[in-house]
Amino acid sequence: MSQQYLLKLLYCQGYIAKDNKIKMIINKFLSLLNRYKTDLPTFTIVGVGPGDPSLLTIAAVDAIKKAKVIVFPISDDNKKSFAAEIVKKYTKFKKNIPIIFPMARKDFDPDEIWSNAVEKIVKFIQNGESVVLLCLGDTSLFASSSNILRLIKNNHAEIITKTIPGISSISAAAALNDFDLVKKGETLIIKECPSSESELTTLIRESKANKTVLAIMKVGKRWNLVRDILKKEDIIDTSLIALSVGMPDQIIQYASQYKKEFMPYFSLILIRFD
């Protein structure tokens, strides 16, 4: 039986995917085939690191080279993809498919965006083409790609999925400044920057009392609020900021040294209470 015929039989225009038991059987069967290194098309989420192409893992490069289709997020029609820029050396002769993730828009409907993305991806796979979805940083930290993976697993159990982790901006920033993210017996909290003064103040004070290490992500437009609280809590001289890690405009310095009134979207703060 040829691979093309097998694929058509398994997908069967979506009819067989309606039965959960059949979904499970197909998924196990395809996983077994994949274990024996068949060339069935796959969907792979690839973490590409924070911005520096030299931080790409070997596994990430291998997956990109093998895929026929490279899907990557953009914020709107006129903007480039940071993730696509990182891997452009390996994607010149691929099908490069941008998908709009307008996260900053107030009318953003995540369910519609994820569903449309899944529909595009599934069509390529049903045509026998392996797809890689690029993910900036690591695939497990604030990654929109996890929503797409969830939908594919729930609605297209016959598709073989893989996830390749990448270096996060947190670990990259820590390494660039010899910053210990967490030592034996310590706790690390990774959290998106709170929008209110009271929430951020509580987070910092509780972390200080428990000597918990803080990694505050996506500071961006909230920098003025954050700066004022860092001053009030007398930790502005020891709080490490990292902006656009791995990118040409990278900045890593202590918060007291940063004089601008705003921060870019890709911004984080690392705080220890030694």
Named regions from a protein language model:
Residues 34-39, 62-63, 125, 133, ...:
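Solvent-exposed alpha-helices and their adjacent loops that cap or buttress functional pockets
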Residues 109-119, 176-179, 201-207, 252-258:
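Short, surface-exposed amphipathic charged segments that create phosphate/polyanion-binding patches used
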Residues 43, 205-274:
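A contiguous loop/helix-start segment that scaffolds small-molecule binding in enzyme catalytic cores
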Residues 116-124, 179-192, 258-268:
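A polyampholytic, Gly/Pro-enriched intrinsically disordered region
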Residues 2, 6-14, 22-53, 58-60, ...:
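Class I S-adenosyl-L-methionine
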Residues 141-206:
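Class I SAM-dependent methyltransferase SAM-binding "motif I" and its flanking Rossmann-like core
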Residues 81-83, 107-109, 172-173, 193-194, ...:
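Short, charged, surface-exposed secondary-structure boundary motifs
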Residues 77-80, 104, 168-171, 189, ...:
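Short gly/pro/ser/thr-enriched loop/turn and capping motifs at secondary-structure boundaries
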